[in-house]
């Protein structure tokens, strides 16, 4: 194993990267509340893993979505556990994200020179909520259907462009197959990609600037 490691280390300088990661200075005022962002990331990774597993069985059509979710829960080996963990970690992710935002705000972590870190964090918060809205509709049961109908109908109150925004969200005038397709695409591809990009930016800025000092 040492020969293999040395071979890679000569070409990629793995050891220097590992030393840089493990030797980063941690201020003495840091406590467990500074771990909330990391816990949020962990929940996101659990979401990715369990969500990916369910894509093998879920069918994003208005006629088969609900039945496919039932199939996952009752027929797929450990399907009930995978979906339950997905739901629990989703709730935990939202909770940890809210607590993380409060911690950063209360400790002044948004102040100069960390304004852009705060901005990317706010964007990630919006993405997290969007995950919840789009994921809620995917079982396409009564709760999911009416939730989508209400949420996508809210922009209708906007003057001039309201109708256009509603149709853009739904994919048609009413809520139906185009709506489910769009929400599925957002939930499984667009939002995870955006989350990954902004998380990378968020972490790189934290890495560069370090953790903010005490108030």
Curated annotation (Swiss-Prot):
Keywords on record: Chloroplast, Electron transport, Heme, Iron, Membrane, Metal-binding, Photosynthesis, Plastid, Thylakoid, Transmembrane, Transmembrane helix, Transport
PROSITE patterns: CYTB_NTER
Chain sites annotated for binding heme c: 35
Listed GO CC annotations: chloroplast thylakoid membrane
One example of a Gene Ontology biological process annotation: photosynthesis
Binding site for heme b 2: 86, 187
One family name in Pfam for this protein: Cytochrome_B
Membrane topology term: Multi-pass membrane protein
Residues that, per the record, bind heme b 1: 100, 202
CDD domains referenced in this protein's UniProt entry, alphabetically: Cytochrome_b_N
Subunit structure: The 4 large subunits of the cytochrome b6-f complex are cytochrome b6, subunit IV (17 kDa polypeptide, PetD), cytochrome f and the Rieske protein, while the 4 small subunits are PetG, PetL, PetM and PetN. The complex functions as a dimer.
Note from the entry: Heme 1 (or BH or b566) is high-potential and absorbs at about 566 nm, and heme 2 (or BL or b562) is low-potential and absorbs at about 562 nm.
Function, as annotated: Component of the cytochrome b6-f complex, which mediates electron transfer between photosystem II (PSII) and photosystem I (PSI), cyclic electron flow around PSI, and state transitions.
Protein's UniProt name: Cytochrome b6
Protein's organism: Ostreococcus tauri
């Amino acid at each position: 194993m040492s020969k293999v490691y040395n071979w890679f280390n000569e070409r990629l300088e793995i050891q220097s990267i590992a030393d840089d990661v493990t030797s980063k200075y941690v201020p003495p005022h840091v406590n467990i509340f500074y771990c909330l962002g990391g816990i949020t990331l962990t929940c996101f990774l659990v979401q990715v893993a369990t969500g990916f597993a369910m894509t093998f069985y879920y069918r994003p059509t208005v006629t088969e979505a609900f039945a496919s979710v039932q199939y996952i829960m009752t027929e797929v080996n450990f399907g009930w556990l995978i979906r339950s963990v997905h739901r629990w970690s989703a709730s935990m992710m939202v909770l940890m994200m809210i607590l993380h935002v409060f911690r950063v705000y209360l400790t002044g972590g948004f102040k100069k020179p960390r304004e852009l870190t705060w901005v990317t964090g706010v964007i990630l918060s919006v993405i997290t909520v969007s995950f919840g809205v789009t994921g809620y509709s995917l079982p396409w049961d009564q709760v999911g259907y009416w939730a989508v109908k209400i949420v996508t109908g809210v922009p209708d109150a906007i003057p001039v462009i309201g109708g256009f925004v509603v149709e853009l969200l739904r994919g048609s005038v009413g809520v139906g197959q185009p709506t489910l397709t769009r929400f599925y695409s957002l939930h499984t591809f667009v939002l995870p990609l955006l989350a990954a990009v902004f998380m990378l930016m968020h972490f790189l800025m934290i890495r560069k600037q370090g953790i903010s000092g005490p108030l």
